[in-house]
């Protein structure tokens, strides 16, 4: 059985003339899932492997490169990229973003379907953000503790080095004094 690795991202994207949106993504080797919210309403985009393959082929890209570019632009707002969440009818939205490639501005977009339970979807996005924040805070605390321990050890090494240097000077002074006698 093939080991399927998934990665997650969640970003706050600024859309022109509108409130920011949040995009939580789950990235698989051959496709992705998006959950998008404006804080009130939520939408989902779950293209199949075949849909992603077709979209990548339209842009003459291997699926892996298509997914990497999508993750780059949806995982963190990129300077110069224009993001939009436009009406697609029946409560659905179209998420789009621009990017530069070989001097050309390209526009990628995916239709996002209205979530059957926006409250639940919003809670899932907030849970993900809170979990990520807690993990990041824990990591910062651990790294600060490690830094403090290393600082104490470095101070001990410096003290020991100074002591050894002083003992060496005393020893050399004694040897030279005996040699002069």
Language-model-detected regions and their locations in the chain:
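Assembly/interface modules of non-enzymatic eukaryotic complex subunits
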Residues: 1-137
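Intrinsically disordered, low-complexity acidic regions
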Residues: 112-181
